């Protein structure tokens, strides 16, 4: 049996871009866990049986949209707090690059995302934590590089 080639959690990177030309991307400090969700919007339609119209119909599904969501949790780092707040305050979506690095290839998505929410929390005597949620704004273009 061949073992799968896997990667570590730190190799899933969430990066925000600046306003330079070309855009320079950097991963804001502080995430200890992150998650990437790829969604497809579907529209249901009943597919009747032409030979037996009274039979129960099967459901067909048509793809209507694609979407990406990114979330992350970790410590609220002084080095990145303003980066996250600036992105959240922006009326416009911000440049974003999401990378998933394996030993032999890297899968990346580049596009624009909105910082949907930032949650900060803390207990007495412990470090302040953060939870951040982002949503795609238009197409996130996928590339694979060896």
Language-model-detected regions and their locations in the chain:
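Solvent-exposed edge beta-strands and adjacent loop segments
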Residues: 2-73, 114-128, 133
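Short acidic DE-rich linear segments
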Residues: 144-146
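Short, acidic/charged, Gly/Pro-enriched secondary-structure junctions
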Residues: 15, 77-116
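Hydrophobic lipid-interacting interfaces of membrane-associated proteins
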Residues: 137-142
